[in-house]
Regions:
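Conserved beta-loop-alpha segment that forms the PLP phosphate-binding cup at the N-terminus of a helix
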Residues: 89-99
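Solvent-exposed alpha-helices and their adjacent loops that cap or buttress functional pockets
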Residues: 77-78, 88, 103
Length: 111
């Protein structure tokens, strides 16, 4: 089985409690990102094997395993697991590293 990292999306950021996104829940924002990756790549949601989300500050609405909650909000099947990685400012990079080390491909062939 080949592992394929087919796409990624990043949520916008803004000053706390200000701007057009101030009232949007973080799990909703991440769910929209997941939907966009599925749309861009024309994926069948049932073909998604995993969702790994980097979250610098998992508190409030984003403190309840935002990777799992967002995947469900995005309409992925409940059989698709979701995971949240917290390494503060390095959360997104750690999520990519986690993906690479949990994929079935040999580590020495990663380019």
């Amino acid at each position: 089985m080949d592992a394929i990292v087919a796409g990624w999306v990043r949520t916008p950021f803004h000053r706390a409690h200000k701007g057009a996104l101030a009232g949007v829940r973080p799990d909703t924002m991440v769910a929209e990102c997941i939907k966009e990756v599925v749309r861009r790549l024309e994926l069948n949601p049932a073909e998604v094997d995993d969702v790994i989300v980097g979250c610098a500050y998992p508190e409030g609405e984003q403190g309840y395993n935002i990777g799992r909650m967002a995947s469900l909000l995005a309409g992925l099947p409940d059989t698709v697991p979701g995971m949240t990685i917290n390494r503060l400012c390095g959360s997104s990079m750690q999520a990519v590293i986690c993906l690479l080390y949990t994929s079935p491909s040999p580590r020495d062939s990663l380019e």
